[in-house]
């Protein structure tokens, strides 16, 4: 069991009839949801942590993180887990441990990826993910490898700026 705190800082404005993106708007006060739910986790291999931390770029002025390949891995694993659990985007969450982006940590410090139910008390999705973890990892590899894009896109790794071969290095290393 885990305690999850979800925050919403902004929202996307869209037209109803064609779903055209009209921009984003910052909320005056963040919306939050705090709940206990079920989860499972997997440890990221040490060699993957070393590579991914070595590629992180931080803009000191804005504190904006670039090249977060953990996000690409989480995106692929979440999509693969959704297929196995027959869930929607809003039913499960996938996130890395807080130390994943901390460059001050030793590159050999453990980084974990957590899968959790987005419902109070959980609905058993995390347990099903645990039971099918090997299949989920293999499906994530197939999703990323099988994409027709050249480098990476919103369909396979979630962000076109991420190199899909580097993202693929994560799940292949399990």
Task: Place the predicted regions along the sequence by residue.
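Extended, highly charged accessory segments
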Residues: 1-174
